[in-house]
Amino acid sequence: MIKVGIVGGSGYGAIELIRLLQTHPHVTIAHIYSHSKVDEPLKLTFPHLQHIMQHFEALTVDNNDCDVIFFATPAPVSKTCIPPLVEKGIHVIDLSGAFRIKNREIYEAYYKETAAAQDDLNHAIYSISEWQSFDNNGTKLISNPGCFPTATLLALHPLISEKIVDLSSIIIDAKTGVSGAGRSLSQRVHFSEMNENLSAYAIGNHKHKPEIEQYLSIIAGQDVSVIFTPHLVPMTRGILSTIYVKFSSEYTTESLHKLMTSYYANQPFVRIRDIGTFPTTKEVLGSNYCDIGIYVDETTQTAILVSVIDNLVKGASGQAIQNLNILYDFEVTTGLNQSPVYP
């Protein structure tokens, strides 16, 4: 059995890791770390986890017996705590943005904090699971993608890699539930501010914009810029990303649908919807699926892609476990076969 540790045990990402890893046949949760709740029983913070008798612990590097440690922490914590663990030879899967952006200046412009050391950035492997493979011996630090980038890049990847679109025309209109903001309180997630309300936020300066651009640029082999506008909607979970991009050659809904279904034919967690149907966030709730609906406006030769995920599962903890499966050469669906919760 692989011994796993979870850092940031009092946050939503960690809660999902605990929930999902309980059913993983090759994993045992050895330690749950939280610096603010050391020695407290897990069930005191999360009453729905009454059946788990573990207590929160303080993270240590010396004598740490974990094979893999998941970090579901803010980026500054990850930057400080992860390098010593990697140096010790422990595999780390980081759910924060600390190691996603390889250019330190760009990171600091968007995150408003000092970037990780360049050596650490160079060694971190950014992994959207559907297009990644690892060397178990050589890979020590996996940088899990953000939630908006996951939904967006999975939809755009086939079009960019096939070089069939105008790279200057990408517009991303994305909606997210409030759990994406974490458990910390702020005015914009207060019930009276959020309920019966819809708001755009972080226009032009959202942390996920350079992440999307960086990895689209890698796929395209040239610099790519996007227009990205996120919105906060009054629901707990879910991301719906509507993406508009113009073709550089003629396409129809049928021909694009054929391309997308072929591209993801062997990827169990990406479900391309039938022509004329479009996914909703509730249809992936609690699951590791990304569902994508496709339409081509043939008059303007514009693709309209609707991509939905659960931001806490495929957009965070589920994909982290998917990366664990790839790292250890397990069947990619291991521990992640949960159907969406509906209604």
From Swiss-Prot:
Keywords: Amino-acid biosynthesis, Arginine biosynthesis, Cytoplasm, NADP, Oxidoreductase
Pathway: Amino-acid biosynthesis; L-arginine biosynthesis; N(2)-acetyl-L-ornithine from L-glutamate: step 3/4
GO molecular function, one term: N-acetyl-gamma-glutamyl-phosphate reductase activity
Catalytic center residues: 147
Highest taxon, organism lineage: Bacteria
Catalytic activity: N-acetyl-L-glutamate 5-semialdehyde + phosphate + NADP(+) = N-acetyl-L-glutamyl 5-phosphate + NADPH + H(+)
Top-level EC class as recorded in UniProt: oxidoreductase
GO BP field: L-arginine biosynthetic process
Gene Ontology CC annotations of this record: cytoplasm
Pfam families: Semialdhyde_dh, Semialdhyde_dhC_1
Main localization category: cytoplasm
Record's subcellular location: Cytoplasm
Disulfide bonds: none
Keyword Kinase attached: no
Keyword Oxidoreductase part of the UniProt annotation: yes
EC number(s) on file: 1.2.1.38
Role played: Catalyzes the NADPH-dependent reduction of N-acetyl-5-glutamyl phosphate to yield N-acetyl-L-glutamate 5-semialdehyde.
NCBIfam families, per the entry: argC (TIGR01850)
Recorded family membership: Belongs to the NAGSA dehydrogenase family. Type 1 subfamily.
HAMAP family the UniProt entry points to: ArgC_type1
Protein's name according to its UniProt entry: N-acetyl-gamma-glutamyl-phosphate reductase
Species of the source: Staphylococcus aureus (strain Mu3 / ATCC 700698)
